[in-house]
């Protein structure tokens, strides 16, 4: 049995990890670190855990040993947290859910943990950078195109995300009275996840140098991401669909539907649902996923499973909300 720790366990991604790890068959102990909730029971931050866990948050990581440590601090905090908890020199699997290590900079040894693109590289790795939620959805929509070398023209993306994608810190755009029955565009053509998407595209199709044109939107719901992607594609409809089916044949969490992809089919699961169509000369792909599970904490558990040699679906057999 394995010993896990979560640093930043009181937030949305930390709480989702806590729920997953408390029910993971290979995890014996979960240590939950929170500077804001130290000494308080888990249910103070996550009321739904009242019936499932009686433990309390701690202020600092114990000496361990730990088999895996998840970093769930804010963006720009992970280097400080690794230093504060003396993780740099430990031979412990560290999975970072922030954006701090997603791009290679010559100074860190984290690998990018998108299992559907780089899963074969993850077994035995000790440092994994978890992808962003929008980046996960967009990449799942276009990975087969890049793998075939079919990207040639600009990729146009419209995406909508739930309010939990912005974290727990109070913002004007997270108030119920603003978010409810409302829509807005933010960071058009400049979203921070574009850099990691481009890095993957450069790996899979080096000759493709265009920047995806991405319009992100805030949605009036709490969980979920839907992205709609279209680009020119010379492949026929049948060839296009066969390429997607072949690419994801061994991917347990990615599924193509012949119906319209929708959020309620995937919210609360680690699944991603794809709709793949050809309209004239354009390929149109829709990807739906849960931003907190497949787009964050569930993907982190998937990465843990791969890195530690566990069955990759272990602990991730979750029930969708459905309606």
Segments from the language model and where they lie:
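N-terminal Rossmann-like NAD(P) cofactor-binding subdomain of oxidoreductases
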Residues: 1-181, 186-188, 205-207, 275-279, ...
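A short coil-to-beta-strand element that immediately follows conserved catalytic motifs
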Residues: 29, 153-157, 209-213, 253-257, ...
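Anionic group-transfer/hydrolysis microenvironments
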Residues: 98, 102, 160, 218, ...
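Short Gly/Pro-enriched turn/cap motifs at secondary-structure boundaries
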Residues: 185-189, 217-219, 262-266
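C-terminal substrate-binding/catalytic lobe of Rossmann-fold NAD(P)-dependent dehydrogenases
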Residues: 190-256
């Amino acid at each position: 049995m394995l010993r896990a720790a979560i640093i930043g366990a009181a937030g949305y991604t930390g709480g989702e990890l806590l729920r997953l790890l408390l029910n993971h068959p290979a995890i014996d102990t979960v240590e939950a670190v929170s500077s804001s909730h130290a000494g308080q029971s888990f249910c103070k931050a996550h009321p739904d855990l009242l019936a499932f866990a009686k433990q309390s948050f701690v202020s600092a990581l114990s000496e361990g040993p730990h088999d895996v440590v998840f970093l769930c601090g804010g963006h720009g905090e992970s280097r400080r947290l690794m230093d504060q908890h003396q993780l740099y020199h430990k031979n412990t699997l560290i999975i970072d859910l922030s954006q701090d290590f997603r791009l290679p900079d010559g100074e860190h040894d984290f690998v990018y943990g998108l299992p559907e693109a780089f899963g074969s590289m993850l077994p035995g790795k000790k440092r994994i950078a978890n992808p962003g939620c929008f980046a996960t959805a967009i990449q799942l929509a276009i990975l087969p195109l890049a793998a075939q070398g079919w990207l040639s023209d600009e990729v146009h993306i419209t995406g909508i995300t739930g309010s939990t994608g912005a974290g727990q810190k109070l913002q004007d755009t997270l108030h119920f009275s603003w978010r409810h029955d409302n829509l807005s565009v933010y960071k058009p053509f400049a979203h921070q996840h574009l850099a990691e998407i481009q890095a993957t595209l450069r790996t899979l199709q080096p000759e493709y140098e265009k920047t995806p044109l991405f319009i992100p939107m805030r949605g009036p719901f709490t969980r979920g991401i839907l992205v709609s992607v279209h680009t020119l594609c010379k492949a026929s409809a049948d060839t296009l669909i066969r390429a997607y089916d072949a690419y994801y044949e061994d991917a347990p969490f990615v599924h193509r539907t012949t119906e319209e992809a929708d959020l309620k089919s995937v919210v609360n699961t680690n699944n991603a649902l794809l709709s793949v169509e050809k309209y004239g000369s354009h390929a149109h792909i829709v990807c739906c996923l849960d931003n907190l599970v497949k787009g964050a904490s569930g993907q982190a558990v998937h990465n843990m499973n791969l890195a530690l040699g566990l069955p990759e679906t272990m602990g991730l057999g979750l029930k969708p909300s459905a309606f």
